[in-house]
């Protein structure tokens, strides 16, 4: 396993990590969740990602029980939560980034995950109804209390992230260390263009999600739409409509052919492509089966196969390279 610094922090995070969105407490059994965590940990994965909204808190409960049962050395792994969407309840102050909800969400996550502190705590979305100063102060306070080690953002704009940093600098507080954006072969603009200056200035770490574009960059959908897949789950029609377009399927088929020429598989090529980006700190894997995780962990062996020539072949297939504005 390769380990990278998380932004400019001293924290070392495995290049591949394990996420729990749509799987833990929902799509898979607790037994499979445990098998996935063991397989990941035994292969050097040290970061396990979660959030208050995942399965309305049940995902964190499942992960917490597993962590308690396995009894891993707490210094050997990182665990995260995210605050904004709440755990499914919708009364005032049960969502958002107010000081009240941030504090209560952190305490609830610690209880569900059965840990004394969160290594990473993300603001899951920006909150237009809360002053950024209040959010930065709240996160800084949690760090001072020892409940959180590093805080960050998820799906924030570059402007919002920089505003948080400016507030933190002016008030002599701790700013966000990392951002969790979607990043894959079909979703590139934010990481490759919008954040480009932030990488150079404040040194943003990234924990990217959906590296396989919700499964489109696997062989699942190359010849049709099997019903027993993630995109076939009830309530995820919006995800299916956004992810499964004919254009993407055609590109996936071409990429699959290239992967075969390189002696690898499409998911491994897609993951290796993400890993090749030096601004990516860790790639979050989602898996519902242990053998899928085993295959995806092999992506590290494919990175060196993406030579400049292969990278250009990929660009020709994708035909979507983001262009920075001329200013």
Per-segment meaning from a language model:
Residues 70-97:
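Structural motif corresponding to the early beta-alpha repeats
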Residues 132-318, 326:
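Beta/alpha (TIM)-barrel catalytic core signal, keyed to glycine-rich beta->alpha loops juxtaposed to Asp/Glu
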Residues 25-28, 51-60, 127-131, 158-159, ...:
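Acidic-and-aromatic substrate-binding clefts and catalytic sites of carbohydrate-active enzymes
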Residues 1-77, 116, 144:
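N-terminal binding-site loop/beta-alpha segment at the start of enzyme catalytic domains
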Residues 28-40, 96-113, 161-166:
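Short, acidic/polar
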């Amino acid at each position: 396993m390769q380990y990278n610094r998380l932004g400019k922090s001293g924290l070392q995070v495995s290049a591949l990590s394990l996420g729990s969105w749509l799987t833990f407490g929902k799509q898979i059994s607790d037994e499979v969740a445990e098998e996935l965590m063991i397989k990941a940990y035994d292969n050097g994965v040290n970061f396990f990602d979660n959030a208050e909204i995942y399965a309305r808190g049940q995902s964190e409960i499942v992960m917490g029980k597993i962590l308690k049962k396995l009894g891993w050395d707490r210094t050997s792994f990182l665990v995260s939560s995210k605050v904004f969407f709440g755990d499914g309840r919708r009364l005032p102050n049960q969502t958002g980034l107010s000081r009240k909800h941030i504090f209560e969400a952190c305490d609830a996550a610690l209880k569900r995950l059965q840990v004394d502190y969160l290594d990473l705590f993300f603001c899951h979305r920006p909150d237009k109804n809360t002053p950024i100063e209040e959010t930065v102060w709240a996160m800084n306070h949690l760090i001072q209390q020892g409940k959180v080690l590093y805080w960050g953002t998820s799906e924030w704009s570059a402007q919002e992230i920089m505003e948080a940093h400016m507030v933190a600098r002016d008030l002599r507080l701790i700013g966000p260390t990392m951002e969790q954006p979607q990043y894959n072969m079909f979703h590139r603009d934010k990481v490759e263009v919008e954040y480009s200056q932030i990488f150079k200035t404040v040194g943003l770490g990234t924990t990217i999600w959906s590296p396989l574009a919700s499964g489109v960059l696997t062989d699942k959908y190359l010849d049709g739409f099997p019903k027993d897949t993630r995109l076939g789950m009830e309530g995820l029609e919006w995800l299916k409509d956004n992810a499964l377009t004919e254009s993407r399927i055609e590109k996936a088929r071409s990429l699959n052919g290239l992967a075969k020429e390189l002696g690898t598989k499409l998911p491994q090529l897609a993951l290796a492509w993400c890993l090749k980006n030096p601004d990516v700190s860790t790639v979050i894997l989602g898996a519902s089966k242990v053998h899928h995780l085993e295959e995806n962990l092999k992506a590290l062996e494919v990175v060196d196969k993406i030579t400049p020539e292969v990278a250009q072949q990929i660009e020709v297939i994708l035909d979507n390279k983001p262009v920075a504005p001329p200013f």
